[in-house]
Amino acid sequence: MGSNDLINEAYDDSEVVGEERESKSAWMKRWYQLLTSPLDLQLVINEKLEMINWDAYAKSLAKPLGNFLTILFFIIRLLQDNLIKPNYYKLNVKSGAFDLSKSNKLKEFDYLWEISSSFQNSNQFYAFQSWYFVTLRFLNNLFRFTIFILLSLNLYVSCKFMFGYFKTYNLFHLKKEFNSPNLTKHNLKDLSKEYYEDIYKQSLWSMLKHFFRGSRDDGPHVNQNEDEIFFQLRKWIPTNFMINLFVSFSPTAIVFLSFSDVSFTSAIAIVFHQYILDYIITKRFQRSVDDDLILSSAALQEYEDKHIMARINQCSNIDTLSSAMGTRSKTPRIFTTHSLCGEEIREVYNYEKREFEALPKMTESVPGSRETRIKDYGGISQVSDNQSHPIGFHYSPRMSPYYRDKVLDNNLAQSSSNENLEKGGAFLPNQDQNRPSKSLSPLRKTPLSARQKRFEGSEFNVLNKNDINSILRSPKKKKNYHKR
């Protein structure tokens, strides 16, 4: 063996020693933390338990565990009534109660000593020294301890199921009081910190009552305003895991087995009881609650589809109508509500006064003649019947002066174009001779033959048909009216 091998072995031994020291120091730190701060360990254990999804193990763990505990309690009670109870006297008789060998008076007489010794050997000595009765005595003590543990566990499960799963809801928008013992009225002052400071200043008994009962109830609240009152609902919501554990390890079966003489025929009653309780609570009542939840979800979805979504879609369709100035803002600034009589009220928010103001009622727009609609757009002057204007376009109040000037300019341009067309005597092929032109372009003011000659002699004759169509369909081209 060389020197290098010796060095490697020494190095390996040092690593093992270092790991052992680290493990010992880690165990020492853990024991020190356990002894000095047990609440931290309890907090860690509670966090680990809360992170487990117990409802996922309701069918696979809770129900088999409850049935196993019930069967175990039945077997123990069966052995107690049929094995321990017949030998109760032999197991509980004291060994020194009639021990005649300890009597000094009997020792003086030989014949009495012989009788006492024979009696001792035949009865008491055999009863207390036999392995059979020693085993029964051990089993009796074990059964008592196990029954005490099972009764305590069943009591904990029952109390946890009936009193340990409550959630409190504060209902601030509920106005109608329902006849429910879990619904109570409270004052809004109970939510403030001053209320808890007042409780801390009271006696120990008042603090204990608040701890077990919850927040106080100030009575019927007759003289208080509705805005100062809110309802508090204390709802019982047990978990699915605890429901299955309570049904399979029910206190009714435990009480029945505790106060009755258990035999093999009692197993039929226990099996029937377990099946009926599981069928009523798990397969009927709990599924009924799930069905009510489905109906509530369906009703809420129907209300959302028929009322909320329909109104949102209608408002979005109105907001996204195309106009000359682009789409409108999607932020609703006018709010529509209804009074108690069913009348529609339109309100707008005033940022200066910081309050809503009602808008004046507007009559429904009835489609009238073209001249009537033109008059409505800002007091435009009268026009003749042979003039055409865009129909079906609603101008905003902000742009009404702009479009009023455009309409007047359009009227003047159309009148001048009619005079030029009458003098020229040339019309487009697809143009009605009795109908004036709607365009303001200077090309429409000249005859068709002159325009064709001017175009052929210009530099634009090299453009093909596709280039002309792309120019005419350019997005920069503005339309001041809609075609019907």
Swiss-Prot record:
Biased composition (Polar residues): 430-440
Record GO cellular component, one term: nuclear membrane
Biological source species: Saccharomyces cerevisiae (strain RM11-1a) (Baker's yeast)
Region (Disordered): 416-457
Subunit field text: Interacts with CSM1.
Biological process annotations from GO: maintenance of rDNA; regulation of exit from mitosis
Its membrane topology: Multi-pass membrane protein
Function: Member of a perinuclear network that controls recombination at multiple loci to maintain genome stability. Required for rDNA repeat stability.
Lineage summary: Eukaryota, Fungi, Dikarya, Ascomycota, Saccharomycotina
Cellular compartments annotated: Nucleus membrane
Transmembrane region(s): 145-165, 252-272
Source organism, top-level taxon: Eukaryota
Family recorded in the similarity comment: Belongs to the NUR1 family.
Key words of the record: Membrane, Nucleus, Phosphoprotein, Transmembrane, Transmembrane helix
Protein's recorded name: Nuclear rim protein 1
Positions of modified residues (Phosphoserine): 3, 417, 474
